[in-house]
Structure formats: structure tokens, C-alpha cells
Amino acid sequence: KGHRRIAALTADPDDSSISQLRYSGYARALRELGIPPEEEDVICADDFTVESGCRAMRERLKRPADFTAVFAIADDMAIGAMRALRESGRSIPEDCSIIAIDGINVSEYIHPMLTTLCQPMTAMGTKSVELLLGVIRGGAHDHLTLPTTLRAGESVRDLTK
């Protein structure tokens, strides 16, 4: 929604395929929009937890921060980052927007409600079991992409208005 300086809150992309995939999708989307990903705006957390997201954002905010939005690779990390942003005197979404991936239920109950890309958790579980059983029976490992939905919360400010 008009943001040009977007920080990425990720777990170490060298340690996790989930981090690698989500970060590479984020970076590709930025490049497609003509926005070069800035290395200084990559915030690496230790893991995918609320605590780790909070710690990583606190550490990043010790340096000047001119990003207007944060993309977190997990809802839990975003929730932690929101706390650190508020502690630093920033208001969400007025001073900094935040969006994440997962669609966990608690993201609907925090304030402001987190904007998140929801994964089809039940379908993921079902398809995982089906794929595993197929492999056990000697079948090929299929690549599967499941649809996601955007749950628009209250954590993103529209800068185009």
C-alpha cells in the first residue's frame, strides 16, 4: 500500500528452508515492484518465536530505522516485533506497518489485529499425510502448492492516500 522501504524479519535464512523460501518470495516480490531489497533492512532472529522476533527488532531499532513497514516470515515473530516497535514509541500502523505469514488464530486478537497471509493448515496436514503415505508405498514425491488468503487486519497503513 505504497510502502517503498520494507524491512524483512526472518530467521537465519541459512538455517531453515522455510526462512529461505519465504525470504526469497519477499525479495522477488519487491524486485518485481521495482523496489530493491536493502541488506540493512534484513532483520535476522534466532528462530520463529515471539520472543525472538521481539529481541531481533529491539536490536535493529538501536540503529536509525527509516523503514515504514515490516514483513515478518511468521506471525509469532511479527507479534514480538510489534511489542518492540511499541516499546520504542512507534505506533502501528501509523509509524510502521507490519504484515506476516501464517494466519494463526491469536493474530486476530492482538491490537492492532495483524494483517497476515493465512495458510490452509488443515489442508496442509491432510496433504502431508497423503504425500507421506504415497512415498511409503513407493510413489514419487510430488510438489504441491496450496492456496493462501490474505486476512486484512489493522496493522497496515495505506500510504497511497
Segment roles from a protein language model:
Residues K1-K161:
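Bacterial carbohydrate/catabolite-sensing allosteric modules
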